[in-house]
């Protein structure tokens, strides 16, 4: 008996739930009664003062209509021009075909052809679609007797002009950079060259505040498995809002615990196109000038577009300098600590005597000395970034000089320590990719602690630990340490040394591209 009652209760509860769901679905659908529909839309939108409801009438047909748009998001001039029959109250522009056909009854086709002169028009019967599109800048047109709304593309373009990227300045190369407007960025990609294989696939991301996202790839070059993996990860993004592409980067990367960036960010359209021509995939998000490129390797983070715009010999030397600068950034303070504290015998005698003389009177061990200067430099660097542009760089340079000189005169640090820290800071600026530079700067503190505890052996152990991590790391299935591990001899033509373009006839083997030949 009790089981029967429980089953009956569950059945009644299920019927109530189904009825409630059906009722909600009915409430989300337009009825064609403009007064009733407007009340439902207003209730759905809530108390938003920037949303305008403009009730009008097509006087020649005696049909009521209404416009719904957001002030500032919708282009008023475009609304006035595209809906001049309604907005400007010009009934004489309604053709006789409409006024005579169907005894004054408008059809969807007639509205699009005779009343609306805006090209981008979408039909929808759902109130939720109306609210969503209105808050994205569209204008909703409701007409009495028609149980559907016409969503007009009246988004007001508020983008800045195309400028040179601030974070990737070049001596030689294009001066164009991405903007915050997605349509402008896709146009910049198209303008890089005529090619019918450039594919731009659009997605919608964000569970509450929705944004457009585009993945770009060369259809005849990119590995289909990589493209499908990018699609899968983009579809798997479930977050309220994506204000910047950095959110996308953190949500799609392979190992979120790794200090190394596994996605390359760039403001340069030429760099994106170069990546696409190698078989990579680009991700562009509306509202940010930074595009993402996947898959990537560690060596890519030390490369600059200018490497390919200059001749191969100077480009190779400069690239080699960047690799050396990366090692200096990571290990210079640690090597100083290990040599001073554990292995002074490895230093040449004259240099050891000179260093010993400069350290007389310094009350702190080499680790504390190095930490003090490194932290001071990082604070100055951060302060220089946050201060206004006219005074930011000056504060960083002058502040570093003053603090270094004052610390030496006070006997807190030695002059050789100031030289080491300055060399480390300058070397970090030679790294083209900002996120990689930050990673190396933070990782050097770990190397310093290992050097303070175990000396040179600690530095070697730390290097092996980082190397093993980099070797295990992957970016969308591509080994992060390629082409060193796994070993691809042909890809070494564009590794530490950049060989002449006539020698680099094929695309990177690690990308597993369908079309491998790029120079005939």
From Swiss-Prot:
Q: Where in the cell is it found?
A: Cell membrane
Biased-composition ranges, Basic and acidic residues, are: 15-24
Q: Which GO terms describe its biological process?
A: spore germination
- InterPro entries (alphabetical): Spore_Ger, UPF0353/GerABKA_families
Q: What keywords were assigned to this record? A: Cell membrane, Membrane, Transmembrane, Transmembrane helix
For membrane topology, the record states:
Multi-pass membrane protein
Q: Which GO terms describe its cellular component?
A: plasma membrane
Superkingdom of source: Bacteria
Q: Where is this region: Disordered?
A: 1-24
Bias type Polar residues, positions: 1-11
- Provide the transmembrane region boundaries: 281-301, 323-343, 390-410, 411-431, 445-465
Per its UniProt record, what PANTHER family does this chain match? LEUCINE ZIPPER PROTEIN 4 (PTHR22550:SF5), SPORE GERMINATION PROTEIN (PTHR22550)
Query: Hey, which family's this protein in?
Result: Belongs to the GerABKA family.
Entry protein name? Uncharacterized membrane protein YndD
Where does this protein come from, organism-wise?
A: Bacillus subtilis (strain 168)
